[in-house]
Amino acid sequence: MVRYNAVEDPLCYPGTHVLRNRANIPDQNELDEFEQLMFDSRAREALPDGDLDFAHYRALHRHFFQDVYEWAGQTRIIRTGKGENWFCYPEYIEREANRLFAELAARDHLARTESKEAFAKGASWFLAEINAIHPFREGNGRTQLVFLTMLTRYAGYELDESKLEPKRFLDAMIRSFSGDLAPLAAEIRRMI
């Protein structure tokens, strides 16, 4: 099953939609298992320090996916999307990500929100934007969730990932792609 629409992806094994990987696993299901195993292993380690900027975001991606992909932490080089929604074209990723993270910094990384509801609303804006940019070929969702956890702590709250309902969260992310942030804000609020 094809998970993403992609244009001429040199990162895949020829004739497949399976990303080339350090373990040389040509089967998507096996790669998914290996990727999650490596992610979980790296999650037990200290996270990279940073300033909650795009360089820090890329360092987080590199940390979690370095054992799986040579390009971990590097921005996407091909056009890709899901369903009928295309993500930011690769030639604009750096500019758009830097714009987004500058705006996040101007908002003090959401640390000065007056309530959990206000934080959830701001976090939903950020997640919708970074998801539309989709800077990496794979691993965007997990990197987003790690970064959301960091933002939540920076704002003085805790994110309870045990309350994450994947289907509801994914549906909310999809709706956010067309500008409807309310379901995503509600999902974030439910977890803090």
UniProtKB/Swiss-Prot annotation:
Its job: Probable adenylyltransferase that mediates the addition of adenosine 5'-monophosphate (AMP) to specific residues of target proteins.
Keyword Ribonucleoprotein: no
Similarity-based family: Belongs to the fic family.
Protein name: Probable protein adenylyltransferase y4lH
Keywords: ATP-binding, Nucleotide-binding, Nucleotidyltransferase, Plasmid, Transferase
Enzyme class: transferase
Pfam family, one: Fic
Gene Ontology MF annotations: AMPylase activity; ATP binding
Binding annotation for ATP: K82, G83, G139, N140, G141
Domain Fido residue range list: 52-190
Catalytic function, reaction form: L-tyrosyl-[protein] + ATP = O-(5'-adenylyl)-L-tyrosyl-[protein] + diphosphate; L-threonyl-[protein] + ATP = 3-O-(5'-adenylyl)-L-threonyl-[protein] + diphosphate
Swiss-Prot/TrEMBL GO biological process terms: regulation of cell division
EC nos: 2.7.7.108
Matching PANTHER family: PROTEIN ADENYLYLTRANSFERASE FIC-RELATED (PTHR39560:SF1)
